[in-house]
Protein backbone atom coordinates (compact mmCIF):
# COMPACT_ATOMS: atom_id res chain seq x y z
CA UNK A 1 0.00 0.00 0.00
CA UNK A 2 2.74 2.43 1.01
CA UNK A 3 4.61 1.72 -2.23
CA UNK A 4 1.62 2.74 -4.36
CA UNK A 5 0.92 5.80 -2.23
CA UNK A 6 4.49 7.02 -2.70
CA UNK A 7 4.67 6.13 -6.39
CA UNK A 8 1.32 7.55 -7.56
CA UNK A 9 2.20 11.26 -7.29
CA UNK A 10 5.45 10.73 -9.21
CA UNK A 11 3.80 9.32 -12.34
CA UNK A 12 2.00 11.20 -15.11
CA UNK A 13 -1.78 10.66 -14.98
CA UNK A 14 -1.66 8.85 -18.34
CA UNK A 15 0.51 6.08 -16.83
CA UNK A 16 -1.02 2.62 -16.56
CA UNK A 17 0.13 0.71 -13.47
CA UNK A 18 0.29 -3.08 -13.49
CA UNK A 19 1.37 -5.56 -10.83
CA UNK A 20 2.96 -8.93 -11.59
CA UNK A 21 1.49 -10.69 -8.56
CA UNK A 22 -0.69 -13.76 -8.99
CA UNK A 23 -1.56 -13.88 -5.32
CA UNK A 24 -2.70 -10.36 -4.59
CA UNK A 25 -5.85 -9.07 -6.24
CA UNK A 26 -5.71 -5.69 -7.99
CA UNK A 27 -8.81 -4.52 -6.11
CA UNK A 28 -6.78 -4.66 -2.87
CA UNK A 29 -4.55 -1.82 -4.08
CA UNK A 30 -6.50 0.09 -6.74
CA UNK A 31 -7.55 2.97 -4.51
CA UNK A 32 -3.96 3.60 -3.41
CA UNK A 33 -2.65 4.05 -6.96
CA UNK A 34 -4.36 7.37 -7.60
CA UNK A 35 -5.67 5.92 -10.87
CA UNK A 36 -7.91 2.89 -10.24
CA UNK A 37 -9.19 3.03 -13.83
CA UNK A 38 -5.62 2.43 -15.03
CA UNK A 39 -4.61 -0.23 -12.53
CA UNK A 40 -4.60 -3.97 -13.20
CA UNK A 41 -2.41 -7.07 -13.17
CA UNK A 42 -0.07 -8.46 -15.80
CA UNK A 43 1.24 -11.75 -14.43
CA UNK A 44 4.05 -13.60 -16.20
CA UNK A 45 4.76 -17.30 -15.64
CA UNK A 46 8.22 -18.49 -14.56
CA UNK A 47 10.74 -18.91 -17.41
CA UNK A 48 8.91 -16.48 -19.70
CA UNK A 49 11.40 -17.09 -22.51
CA UNK A 50 9.81 -20.52 -22.99
CA UNK A 51 6.54 -20.30 -21.00
CA UNK A 52 5.51 -17.01 -22.51
CA UNK A 53 2.09 -16.51 -20.98
CA UNK A 54 0.77 -13.25 -19.58
CA UNK A 55 -2.40 -13.25 -17.49
CA UNK A 56 -4.20 -9.91 -17.62
CA UNK A 57 -6.70 -9.24 -14.83
CA UNK A 58 -8.46 -6.00 -14.03
CA UNK A 59 -10.65 -5.05 -11.11
CA UNK A 60 -14.10 -3.45 -10.90
CA UNK A 61 -12.78 0.05 -11.65
CA UNK A 62 -10.37 -0.87 -14.46
CA UNK A 63 -11.32 0.88 -17.69
CA UNK A 64 -12.15 -1.81 -20.31
CA UNK A 65 -10.09 0.13 -22.88
CA UNK A 66 -7.05 -0.03 -20.56
CA UNK A 67 -7.62 -3.77 -20.10
CA UNK A 68 -7.69 -4.20 -23.90
CA UNK A 69 -4.52 -2.08 -24.23
CA UNK A 70 -2.69 -4.36 -21.82
CA UNK A 71 -3.86 -7.46 -23.70
CA UNK A 72 -2.51 -5.88 -26.90
CA UNK A 73 0.74 -4.92 -25.14
CA UNK A 74 1.21 -8.53 -24.02
CA UNK A 75 0.73 -9.69 -27.60
CA UNK A 76 3.20 -7.06 -28.86
CA UNK A 77 5.92 -8.33 -26.54
CA UNK A 78 5.30 -11.85 -27.90
CA UNK A 79 3.47 -13.20 -24.91
CA UNK A 80 0.38 -15.37 -25.14
CA UNK A 81 -2.17 -12.99 -23.66
CA UNK A 82 -4.63 -14.70 -21.32
CA UNK A 83 -7.47 -12.36 -20.33
CA UNK A 84 -8.85 -13.09 -16.86
CA UNK A 85 -12.38 -11.67 -16.78
CA UNK A 86 -13.04 -11.93 -13.04
CA UNK A 87 -10.74 -11.45 -10.05
CA UNK A 88 -9.52 -14.76 -8.66
CA UNK A 89 -6.59 -15.49 -6.35
CA UNK A 90 -4.09 -17.52 -8.33
CA UNK A 91 -5.44 -16.21 -11.63
CA UNK A 92 -5.56 -19.02 -14.23
CA UNK A 93 -2.21 -20.82 -14.03
CA UNK A 94 -1.75 -20.85 -10.27
CA UNK A 95 -5.41 -21.70 -9.63
CA UNK A 96 -4.63 -24.99 -11.35
CA UNK A 97 -0.98 -25.35 -10.32
CA UNK A 98 -1.32 -24.78 -6.55
CA UNK A 99 -3.83 -27.61 -5.93
CA UNK A 100 -1.54 -29.89 -7.96
CA UNK A 101 1.48 -28.91 -5.83
CA UNK A 102 -0.52 -29.24 -2.62
CA UNK A 103 -1.61 -32.74 -3.65
CA UNK A 104 2.02 -33.75 -4.15
CA UNK A 105 3.00 -32.21 -0.82
CA UNK A 106 0.10 -34.00 0.86
CA UNK A 107 1.31 -37.38 -0.46
CA UNK A 108 4.80 -36.63 0.89
CA UNK A 109 3.75 -35.10 4.24
CA UNK A 110 1.37 -38.03 4.86
CA UNK A 111 4.20 -40.49 4.31
CA UNK A 112 2.46 -42.05 1.31
CA UNK A 113 5.59 -41.79 -0.85
CA UNK A 114 8.83 -39.90 -1.41
CA UNK A 115 9.21 -36.81 -3.65
CA UNK A 116 11.11 -38.63 -6.41
CA UNK A 117 8.50 -41.40 -6.73
CA UNK A 118 5.67 -38.85 -6.70
CA UNK A 119 7.40 -36.87 -9.47
CA UNK A 120 8.00 -40.02 -11.53
CA UNK A 121 4.36 -41.06 -11.12
CA UNK A 122 3.32 -37.69 -12.55
CA UNK A 123 5.90 -37.29 -15.31
CA UNK A 124 5.68 -40.85 -16.61
CA UNK A 125 1.95 -41.11 -16.06
CA UNK A 126 1.07 -37.90 -17.89
CA UNK A 127 4.07 -37.12 -20.08
CA UNK A 128 4.54 -33.81 -18.24
CA UNK A 129 8.14 -32.57 -18.11
CA UNK A 130 8.14 -31.93 -14.33
CA UNK A 131 6.47 -33.32 -11.25
CA UNK A 132 5.31 -31.28 -8.25
CA UNK A 133 8.62 -31.36 -6.39
CA UNK A 134 10.64 -30.42 -9.47
CA UNK A 135 8.27 -27.46 -9.90
CA UNK A 136 8.66 -26.53 -6.23
CA UNK A 137 12.43 -26.46 -6.71
CA UNK A 138 11.88 -24.13 -9.69
CA UNK A 139 9.65 -21.66 -7.84
CA UNK A 140 11.66 -21.98 -4.61
CA UNK A 141 10.99 -23.38 -1.16
CA UNK A 142 10.25 -19.91 0.25
CA UNK A 143 7.42 -19.56 -2.26
CA UNK A 144 6.16 -23.05 -1.40
CA UNK A 145 6.15 -22.23 2.34
CA UNK A 146 4.28 -19.01 1.61
CA UNK A 147 1.69 -20.83 -0.52
CA UNK A 148 1.07 -23.53 2.10
CA UNK A 149 0.75 -20.94 4.87
CA UNK A 150 -1.59 -18.79 2.82
CA UNK A 151 -3.86 -21.69 1.89
CA UNK A 152 -3.85 -22.80 5.52
CA UNK A 153 -4.91 -19.40 6.84
CA UNK A 154 -7.25 -17.92 4.21
CA UNK A 155 -10.71 -19.51 4.09
CA UNK A 156 -12.08 -20.15 0.63
CA UNK A 157 -8.76 -20.38 -1.24
CA UNK A 158 -8.80 -24.16 -1.29
CA UNK A 159 -11.59 -25.88 -3.15
CA UNK A 160 -13.98 -27.97 -1.02
CA UNK A 161 -12.99 -31.10 -2.97
CA UNK A 162 -9.28 -30.65 -2.22
CA UNK A 163 -10.06 -29.93 1.44
CA UNK A 164 -11.88 -33.27 1.69
CA UNK A 165 -9.03 -35.10 -0.05
CA UNK A 166 -6.32 -33.73 2.24
CA UNK A 167 -6.04 -34.25 5.96
CA UNK A 168 -6.33 -30.83 7.66
CA UNK A 169 -3.26 -31.36 9.85
CA UNK A 170 -1.14 -31.77 6.76
CA UNK A 171 -0.92 -28.03 6.09
CA UNK A 172 1.02 -27.59 9.34
CA UNK A 173 3.14 -30.66 8.57
CA UNK A 174 3.82 -29.46 5.01
CA UNK A 175 4.75 -25.99 6.23
CA UNK A 176 7.12 -27.35 8.89
CA UNK A 177 8.81 -29.83 6.53
CA UNK A 178 9.31 -27.16 3.87
CA UNK A 179 10.49 -24.53 6.38
CA UNK A 180 13.01 -27.00 7.85
CA UNK A 181 14.39 -27.65 4.36
CA UNK A 182 14.51 -23.92 3.62
CA UNK A 183 16.32 -23.21 6.90
CA UNK A 184 18.93 -25.87 6.02
CA UNK A 185 19.34 -24.55 2.46
CA UNK A 186 18.08 -27.82 1.01
CA UNK A 187 16.09 -28.52 -2.14
CA UNK A 188 14.30 -31.63 -3.31
CA UNK A 189 16.82 -32.04 -6.14
CA UNK A 190 20.44 -30.92 -6.20
Which sequence ranges carry the predicted segments?
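NAD(P)-dependent Rossmann-like dehydrogenase/reductase catalytic/cofactor-binding core
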Residues: 61, 65-68, 75-88, 105, ...
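An alpha-helix initiation/capping motif
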Residues: 90-98, 119
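Short acidic alpha-helix initiation/capping motifs at coil-to-helix transition points
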Residues: 95-100, 124-127
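N-terminal alpha-helical segment
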Residues: 49-53, 100-101, 174
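Rossmann-like NAD(P)-binding element
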Residues: 1-16
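Rossmann-fold dinucleotide-binding core
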Residues: 16-85, 94
